[in-house]
């Protein structure tokens, strides 16, 4: 793996040569339905202070999420564990790439403390890829889940994990910790993996999600994709079928937004009515829940969606019993 880093860029972020040496791509002007208001509120400031005081990293900031103001105003945040430097260089992602630092042994306790301070009823925990670790960070995920359970027993826990590619036994460690929701994003259709997500393997990710259900059928499974990367509609429908074949409960679909000129270009902005059609089709395919809109992101409205997931499962069980 190449370890020379490029830090000469507008944001000062670490840039893997694979990204730094890419030709510039035009950043298209966003249509009106993509733009979001950015109010600064007391809730936003309080959330930021809790994150800073506990020395935590959030994917909200690192990935430049368009929903950060809305979520932080409500004291919702997605914590990103195992540092802020990723070992992969996906073409869509704005997170820094390079050689990560050692794991912080105090991080599980700090995450749990922040969850309690914020009074979260549902927390989302994600991470960078840590291909440098023997278990891909599985034990660390389990320790964070354990710490949150001890500090806030009533809080439900959703994790958004990397693929643990070539990390034998890692998935079993995470599932054994019993998160309430296991999310692993496919990100895009298989034909786009070579350019968009070159370090990952589409069918490995499908199998990962399927294996979660085999290990513990009570855990909700979830996966998301971005659209606007040049995929065809029929490819999205086939991807839905692949997820359902893995018994995935919940799917999210959102518009890809290009972070910088060095990232994969937006091929097109998908219109809101197309997103609505994907939601309708997804429900007919058997998902318990489908969230599909231009600004949908994996963790957006995660707490509300968890309540909907539970209700949908209960309704399904009731219909089967009658």
Curated annotation (Swiss-Prot):
Residues 1-12 have a biased composition (Polar residues). GO terms for molecular function: 4 iron, 4 sulfur cluster binding; lipoate synthase activity; metal ion binding. Its cofactor is [4Fe-4S] cluster. It is an enzyme of class 2 (transferase). Gene3D superfamilies: Aldolase class I (3.20.20.70). Binds 2 [4Fe-4S] clusters per subunit. One cluster is coordinated with 3 cysteines and an exchangeable S-adenosyl-L-methionine. [4Fe-4S] cluster 2 binds at residues 86, 90, 93. It is found in: Cytoplasm. [4Fe-4S] cluster 1 binds at residues 60, 65, 71, 299. Its EC number is 2.8.1.8. GO terms for cellular component: cytoplasm. Residues 1-22 are annotated as: Disordered. It catalyses: [[Fe-S] cluster scaffold protein carrying a second [4Fe-4S](2+) cluster] + N(6)-octanoyl-L-lysyl-[protein] + 2 oxidized [2Fe-2S]-[ferredoxin] + 2 S-adenosyl-L-methionine + 4 H(+) = [[Fe-S] cluster scaffold protein] + N(6)-[(R)-dihydrolipoyl]-L-lysyl-[protein] + 4 Fe(3+) + 2 hydrogen sulfide + 2 5'-deoxyadenosine + 2 L-methionine + 2 reduced [2Fe-2S]-[ferredoxin]. HAMAP family: Lipoyl_synth (MF_00206). Belongs to the radical SAM superfamily. Lipoyl synthase family. PANTHER family: LIPOYL SYNTHASE, LIPOYL SYNTHASE, MITOCHONDRIAL. This is Lipoyl synthase.
